Amino acid sequence: MRRRRAEIRKVPPDPIYNDVLVSKLINRVMWDGKKSIAQKIVYKAMEILAEKTKKAPLEALHQAIENVRPIVEVRPRRVGGATYQVPIEVQEPRKTSLALRWIVEAARAKKGRPMAEKLGEELVNAFNNTGTAIKKKEDVHRMAEANRAFAHFRW
């Protein structure tokens, strides 16, 4: 066990849009430490997003991520030999990281096109409240709703 709680590291803003959220998306897309490739992918995806939504790329990205952010999730909790799925509210930083993770996973799951196109399309879908990432959020909310009876087990 840790002696004290781990410090939350500050993510520096990205060089082009000067935004922390874009930086986090780049880090989420990055594989094997290849940041320059991840940056190209994300910036190309942002261009696609701006083109399709007719909005400023940063504004559109923030809206897309806001649409995917979950409000509640379920966590397993053991009570007397049984494991219950207990719905709990999601903390602010986790909302954003889950949204980014779901968007990138949804883009990676698509096959047969460059990652920038897939990510751009997934961001457009998230902006329009459709797509795989939004479906994932709705599934998580549905699970929480189905297990509402166990909400009193919260800790």
Curated annotation (Swiss-Prot):
Q: Which UniProt keywords apply?
A: Ribonucleoprotein, Ribosomal protein, RNA-binding, rRNA-binding, tRNA-binding
Q: Which domain of life is it from?
A: Bacteria
Q: Report any one BP term from Gene Ontology.
A: translation
**Database matches in InterPro entries:** Ribosomal_uS7, Ribosomal_uS7_bac/org-type, Ribosomal_uS7_CS, Ribosomal_uS7_dom, Ribosomal_uS7_dom_sf
Indicate yes or no for the key word Ribonucleoprotein: yes
| The keyword Ribonucleoprotein is annotated on this UniProt entry | yes
One GO cellular component term of this record is: small ribosomal subunit
What are the GO MF terms of this UniProt record? rRNA binding; structural constituent of ribosome; tRNA binding
| Family indicated by similarity | Belongs to the universal ribosomal protein uS7 family.
Instruction: Sum up the protein's function in the record's words.
Output: One of the primary rRNA binding proteins, it binds directly to 16S rRNA where it nucleates assembly of the head domain of the 30S subunit. Is located at the subunit interface close to the decoding center, probably blocks exit of the E-site tRNA.
Summarize subunit and interaction data from the UniProt record for this chain: Part of the 30S ribosomal subunit. Contacts proteins S9 and S11.
Q: What is this protein called?
A: Small ribosomal subunit protein uS7
